[in-house]
Amino acid sequence: IKTLNNHYGEFDIYIGHSLGSMAILKYCEQASNVKKIVTIGSGDQMRTIFDNFITSVGLKFKTLERMKTYFQDKYNININDYDASYVVRQQQTPSLIVHDEDDLDIDVSCSVNIHKQHPKATLMVTKGLGHRRILRDEKVIHKVISFIQAS
């Protein structure tokens, strides 16, 4: 995100999907000129992301702990500080949070948690679109456009 901003200039609207939503929320935690944020199918807790990765590739729980420690030590961070529902607690940028209740990749509860913690968020929950089809659904597209165009 920083690289894109350095190359093209600062954006004032950010739209992200899945893990990209989490990255945008973390970036916007420190950004001052952001006017609107849209997340679609966002994850929430980094621990869950790591758990799902470990499970999907068939690794052991011990590996998860090693990965977590590696990232925390290498980048001098607390991995929990990257949880989306944590980074939005002080967010004052109007945000639209979109998620499908039939998303099999990332549970809708992630976006519900983000919405509960975000003081300026609107939540849109859809049905029957899943994690990817939601991106091309006309109702979702119109909602996102309306949200961005609203003053």
Task: Describe the role of every protein-language-model region.
Residues 129-141:
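Catalytic histidine-centered segment of alpha/beta-hydrolase-like enzymes
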Residues 1-12:
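Conserved acidic catalytic loop of the alpha/beta-hydrolase fold
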Residues 84, 93, 107-116:
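Short alpha-helix in the alpha/beta-hydrolase fold that links the catalytic acid
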Residues 30-77:
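Hydrolase active-site cap/lid region
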Residues 115-132:
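Catalytic histidine neighborhood in serine/cysteine hydrolases
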Residues 90-92, 97-99, 103:
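Short beta-strand/loop motif that positions the catalytic acidic residue
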Residues 15-24:
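Gly/Ala-rich beta-loop-alpha elbow adjacent to hydrolase catalytic centers
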